[in-house]
């Protein structure tokens, strides 16, 4: 008799042309992820081949009970690392039955920015460093920490190895490989300064795909931590006190920045970002004021400053970029729970479309 594991791993490719499409969307909090699956005829190579679908928005905080239908529009597809075969993950955004984007659909506005001819011509690249914390399920306390207590001070944990310094590496490595399988442009992982905290990087990704890839990478991580009985936290400051927070540093460049003379373009873009500091901070994640204190490798939330190789700045420029006179810069302000559609779209809009006045 087949075991549960056998059935979960059942290969359907020899017996049917049907595949399972897992539709993923962002829920009512703007940070929670929801999904449900449907059977479609495969293989699917483009989201345009997939039907729209719907869900009960009254159960996700996105619609009233008397008019609860929200419509899912498939926007990006990835290979499913859980079901494998030809099965897929589908990143969707959400609309009313009349075709209007619902308030939590931030992808719609970002896609408009990225489709603007001036933005498209600049081919904006993003590399997003997604920090996160792994928590013990029943106590909501970081993995590897004594329950109700604290580990030794920060210092030994960043990029460390060893059972007393690195907690949750099996989850991190499983996520890394699952993202590569899915087709996400995940570029690396590392242990972070606070024990139980990790980071993965996605990019360089062009335009709207950066947001799609971060959201699906988050979804895959949620699924893996679910399997491991661990809780994923994107809280930007999960533990009070002398512990690092969690951010989503966003590396950015345009075609003009990557070409000869690009350093002057970078400095002009940073000047624009400084003029809109308050607007960006307001959109860069909930609870970010607990993280951006001027300590623990952050700039104070009320102060905008930039510097070369300065991890205490709002914007950091790398030594290589300064030396070569072209390259990219890093916006260090976004919180770990930021919406990548909002952040990437806003950076492009401010630096490319806004005239600076």
UniProtKB/Swiss-Prot annotation:
Domain of life of the organism encoding this protein: Eukaryota
Localization of this protein: Cytoplasm
Database matches in Pfam families: Gln-synt_C, Gln-synt_N
Domain named GS beta-grasp: residues: 19-99
Keywords annotated in UniProt: ATP-binding, Cytoplasm, Ligase, Nucleotide-binding
Cellular compartments per GO CC: cytoplasm
Name assigned to this protein: Glutamine synthetase root isozyme 1
Organism: Zea mays
Upper taxonomic lineage: Eukaryota, Viridiplantae, Streptophyta, Embryophyta, Tracheophyta
């Amino acid at each position: 008799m087949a075991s549960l594991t056998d059935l979960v791993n059942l290969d359907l490719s020899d017996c049917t042309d049907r595949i399972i499409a897992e539709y993923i969307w962002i829920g009512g909090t703007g940070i929670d992820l929801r999904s449900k699956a449907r059977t479609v005829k495969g293989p699917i190579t483009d989201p345009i081949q997939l039907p729209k679908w719907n869900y009960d928005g009254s159960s996700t905080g996105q619609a009233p009970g008397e008019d609860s239908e929200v419509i899912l529009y498939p926007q990006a597809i990835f290979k499913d690392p859980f079901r494998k075969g030809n099965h897929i993950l589908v990143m969707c955004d959400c609309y009313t039955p009349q075709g209007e984007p619902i308030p939590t659909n931030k992808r719609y506005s970002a896609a408009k920015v990225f489709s603007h001819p001036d933005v498209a011509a600049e081919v904006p690249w993003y590399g997003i460093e997604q920090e996160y914390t792994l928590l013990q399920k029943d106590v909501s306390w970081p993995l590897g920490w004594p329950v109700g207590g604290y580990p030794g001070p920060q210092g030994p944990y960043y990029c460390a190895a060893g059972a007393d310094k690195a907690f949750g590496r099996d989850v991190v490595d499983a996520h890394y490989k699952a993202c590569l399988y899915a087709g996400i442009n995940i570029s690396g992982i590392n242990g972070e300064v606070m024990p139980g905290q990790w980071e993965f990087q996605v990019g360089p990704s062009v335009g709207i795909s950066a947001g799609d890839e971060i959201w699906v990478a988050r979804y895959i991580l949620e699924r893996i931590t679910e399997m491991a009985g661990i809780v994923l936290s994107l809280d930007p400051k999960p533990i009070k006190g002398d512990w690092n927070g969690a951010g989503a540093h966003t590396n950015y460049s345009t075609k003009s920045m990557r070409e000869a003379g690009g350093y002057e373009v970078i400095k002009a873009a940073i000047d624009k970002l400084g003029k809109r500091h308050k607007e960006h901070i307001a959109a860069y994640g909930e609870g970010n004021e607990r993280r951006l204190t001027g300590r623990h490798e952050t700039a104070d939330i009320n102060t905008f400053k930039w510097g070369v190789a300065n991890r205490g700045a709002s914007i950091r420029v790398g030594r290589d970029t300064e030396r070569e006179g072209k390259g990219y810069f890093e916006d260090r302000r976004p919180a770990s729970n930021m919406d990548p559609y909002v952040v990437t779209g806003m950076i492009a809009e401010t630096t490319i479309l806004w005239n600076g006045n």
